[in-house]
Amino acid sequence: KETATDYELDADIAYHDLQAKYIVSVPKHIAVKDKGGKVYRERSTQINGNGDITNITMHNGDKPSVYDMTYDAYGNLASLTKPENHKGQRMRYNYTYDDVLHTLVTSVKDAYGYTSSTVYDYKWAVPLETSDLNGNKMRYTYDGMGRPSTILAPKELESGRPYTLKFEYHPAERYAR
């Protein structure tokens, strides 16, 4: 319950039942109402057998907004399709993950074919280089403890500068105790 100035709202939440898999906290339906029963927000979800949300429907009057998701064999989000726009078109994003850890997003491709990508340092699971949909690159370096050392943005990369941001740590290469 949330109370604000002159009105009180209740959030009624129902959950999907996957107790056999110990999944008990995935919301199935939520409705936010005032004391008189007027609904201010309402959403519902559908899930797959793993408890992954495959569909979110936001009930906004007569035309609901629908999000659809798919997952890969590792349980990572493989695609996200957003609600229709005014022309009935839906934007879709496809996600690709690394072949080593199967957890780091290496590329995102949208419905227009635009792609952004990331190359990682697997020791720290941090980006070494990113490339946006326009081909602009950023590069990152890290110290021996996985902390950022330098960040090189597109403008400085193009002009041959050594960094855009540089970090120093004192004392260097030591863990806090």
Predicted regions and their residues:
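Acidic, low-complexity segments
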Residues: 1-177
